[in-house]
């Protein structure tokens, strides 16, 4: 008798629990996601620093649903002639992927490409003389490539 009563109560309770789980509201993306994305995709050094810190601590930002994936500098060298362009490319990819997901890529592409150029130029500041000129020239070339062919 006890087993029948337990079995009779178990099925409805399981069904109720499943319904409650299915009916639980999905986590909403924070309302300030566009502002955070904009803040992290500016030409200023602070913008890059904030993005790099967030990238290093992605789990803190998981509710925002940002796309952190990157192929770095795509088919171009990530560190041409030893110049450290890899993270500038990752920052650029972050901007492209997330503005595409937001449906506002075309309006933001010029700024994202300028941000990329600013990041590359900052990567060149550690050099002097001919080496700096070479780095700046490569930064300009990478910038022109994304400006013209980036999509």
Residue spans for each PLM region:
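Extended terminal accessory/targeting regions
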Residues: 2-12, 20-151
